[in-house]
Curated annotation (Swiss-Prot):
It comes from African swine fever virus (isolate Pig/Kenya/KEN-50/1950). Plays a role in virus cell tropism, and may be required for efficient virus replication in macrophages. Belongs to the asfivirus MGF 360 family. Pfam families: ASFV_360. InterPro entries: ASFV_MGF360. One of its GO terms (biological process) is taxis. This is Protein MGF 360-21R.
Length: 364
């Protein structure tokens, strides 16, 4: 058996994210460096955000969220440790539930209460942290929290409502509780970042939100989750409605293609693309064989969109991309590789650009 390490050496090893011998586990537990079934590890993610990892939180918690959980659990040693490692002790006021722990937070520098701006700052630190553990725990700690449900917190409510309006088509915001709005928000974040563990958590816990998951997948161009739910569930939404939803978002090539392969009317997708003035989606629809030029031209004229009028007026130059249409791929990974936004070039967009160059040459 190895010689027991000092606390200082163990902390350094944990901080450096090196392997910790199982022989040292009993020391880690005694020293308060053990949480939810494993050693605590401090690390940073690809966005250089500090995070805490443990056996139950393998993909990481944003450090302030870890502090909030430690405060809820009244785990005094971890509250002190996370604060020493850089967590904002004021975040702990979100979940404090005993006077003893509140006094500890005060002694570590916490304010008496958080104002509306500070509550919003807590949320903003958490919402873009891309891990399943973080999304799930954020939902569990915030969605029923009185500080976040307060009607006085008007700016926070506007942010949530604004996020939901971008993807809401099947419900009226005023008709659901703010608690459900928060649940839908965190669910949408899981789909946005394709966090499969978090998606499964919401899927199993909130069966009534299955259509919301589908709408989010279409809205965020998440062909992986679209494929998953389309094949797992009896989707109550028509495939043509699905392609109309995804065309309402810019550069949704993968989900447009998936819906097309599953039988959606590409002309309807073309019309929505023109209505939304999404040029790239329009060219992609033409690549997939869309031919609704006359109807789309009329819409473009009504909108006084001269660029789209010019594009649609060159209909005789365009033709379907047979190599794209013939593939009929439904594998999400292959679709994403084929239609990667940075690498994919529309055949018909290139034709349009060449015609512009030729016309410019004619002028000179």
């Amino acid at each position: 058996m190895s010689t027991p390490s000092s606390l200082q050496v163990l902390v350094k090893r944990v901080l450096d994210f090196q392997h910790v011998s199982e022989d040292d586990y009993c020391i880690l537990k005694c020293c308060g460096l053990w949480w939810h079934g494993g050693p605590i590890m401090l690390s940073t993610n690809e966005d250089n955000q500090m995070m805490i990892k443990s056996a139950s939180f393998k993909d990481g918690l944003e450090i302030n969220l870890a502090l909030m959980m430690a405060v809820q659990e009244n785990n005094c040693s971890l509250i002190e440790l996370f604060t020493e490692w850089g967590a904002d002790i004021n975040s702990g006021l979100v979940t404090v539930n005993t006077e003893y722990t509140r006094n500890l937070c005060r002694n570590l520098g916490a304010k008496e209460t958080l104002n509306k701006r500070e509550i919003l700052d807590v949320f903003l630190k958490l919402k873009n942290f891309k891990s399943s553990n973080n999304i799930i725990l954020s939902h569990e700690l915030l969605s029923n929290n009185p500080l976040f449900l307060s009607e006085d917190n008007d700016y926070f409510r506007r942010i949530i409502n604004c996020n939901l309006r971008r993807i809401s088509i099947n419900f009226i915001l005023d008709e659901i509780s703010f608690n459900e709005k928060l649940t839908r928000f965190w669910y949408s974040q899981a789909v946005l970042y394709n966090l499969t563990e978090a998606i499964q958590y919401f899927y199993q816990k909130y069966e009534h939100l299955n259509e919301w998951r589908l709408i989010c997948a279409l809205s965020f161009n998440n062909v992986f989750d679209l494929h998953e739910i389309y094949n797992k569930e009896k989707v109550g939404m028509d495939i043509n409605q699905m392609i109309e939803i995804t065309c309402a978002y810019m550069c949704s090539y993968s989900t447009i293609y998936y819906c097309f392969v599953m039988g959606a009317d590409i002309n309807r997708a073309m019309i929505i693309s023109v209505t939304k003035s999404y040029t790239y989606n329009l060219f992609f629809c033409i690549d997939l064989g869309a031919t609704a030029f006359e109807e789309c031209l009329e819409i473009a004229k009504q909108q006084n969109n001269n660029e789209l009028v010019k594009i649609l007026s060159l209909k005789n130059y365009y033709s379907p991309d047979s190599s794209l249409i013939s593939l009929k791929i439904t594998d999400p990974e292959k679709i994403n590789i084929l239609l990667d936004e940075e690498n994919y070039e529309s055949k018909n967009e290139l034709i349009y650009e060449e015609s512009n160059i030729n016309n410019s040459d004619d002028i000179f």
